[in-house]
């Protein structure tokens, strides 16, 4: 598997890199959480801007992300607006979603930018090109909170993300049974073995899928989300346990 090197953090090599999500409403609470996270044993902080009370104000978004960049010091910053259709807090029109992404790129503060595969649609390749021109790596994401698609569909979707030049395809599915967790893990292995052009991020959600968040190094998932006190998705495991298990399973 290839790796993505962002300021010395080699995503796709060795232990999966740990992401902590910020899901606070106010700028003050966001920055307070960022200050706490800046001292924790994690590699990256995700700002879930769909939780931000000022999400409709470009000026408020720009100000907050600029302050976040300073507060997080050497931690990587992933900026995400998770749309309602993919399990997020807010709905945006297609035009509003594109405007948000371009605003974040203009701030020159993000290390990584989440771009939803289906929400971006035909604009995906151009958005990825714009992000790369701004020096920002792209996490191209797809989430299914109702089910886990078949392995072939999971692989096909991640390959399409690679073909659009995404740096890190990301896919999450909700398992209805144990076999669904195995399907997602098998898709992850197939990507690592047969399509190693990029690292990938995968997870099976909920309590049933929690094992997928901890065994990424064995199966080929390059990053995992940990719960530092408030989860941003079902099945996230606490940071202390994540670090302990990742160390225990390190190859």
Each predicted region: which residue ranges?
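Active-site beta->alpha loop and helix N-cap motifs at the rims of alpha/beta catalytic domains
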Residues: 3, 14-133, 143-148
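Short boundary motifs at domain starts and secondary-structure transition points
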Residues: 7-13
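Catalytic alpha/beta core domains of metabolic enzymes, predominantly
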Residues: 102, 112, 117-251
